[in-house]
């Protein structure tokens, strides 16, 4: 996940799903953004213009969850897409425990261990990398956009329920 993607259609439906899950199970859901600074990925990443699917803000999707919809409206402004600010202010913190530390290639293991400690009280953790599950473990910059298989195994060994989308 990158700040610039915050508030796109994927976030809208992800937040609806996590809020619903939290309410039905009567427990907070962990959300590990797999937050990445695009500068760490290189110049080509900085020049991408993907993640701009915000047409849902112009139609009647607001009826699904008006609170989430109103919070997403702010992110039409690119400059306001700051995950840390969002997680401090959103009503969703009642339902979701957000892990906001940025992952880096050189400190990935330390970052992951911090996430494990952070989610010690959550039974269910939603993993939100840019590109889904890696085919193999790697320490490359590009691997920051993926969940590593070893990370999933570790969470499972701790009896966590892991949810993520494969792209």
What is the predicted function of each stretch?
Residues 1-167:
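Class I S-adenosyl-L-methionine-dependent methyltransferase catalytic core
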């Amino acid at each position: 996940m990158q700040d610039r993607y915050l508030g796109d259609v994927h976030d809208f439906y992800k937040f609806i799903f996590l809020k619903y899950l939290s309410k039905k199970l009567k427990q907070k859901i962990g959300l590990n953004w797999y937050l990445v600074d695009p500068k760490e990925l290189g110049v080509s990443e900085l020049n991408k213009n993907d993640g701009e699917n915000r047409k849902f803000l112009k139609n009647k999707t607001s009826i699904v969850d008006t609170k989430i919809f109103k919070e997403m409206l702010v992110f039409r402004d690119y400059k306001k897409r700051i995950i840390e600010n969002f997680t401090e202010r959103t009503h969703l913190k009642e339902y979701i425990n957000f892990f906001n530390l940025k992952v880096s290639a050189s400190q990935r293991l330390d970052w992951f261990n911090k996430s494990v400690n952070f989610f010690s009280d959550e039974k269910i953790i939603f993993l939100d990398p840019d590109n889904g599950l890696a085919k193999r473990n790697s320490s490359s910059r590009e691997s920051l956009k993926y969940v590593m298989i070893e990370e999933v195994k570790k969470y499972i060994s701790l009896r966590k329920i892991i949810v993520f989308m494969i792209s």
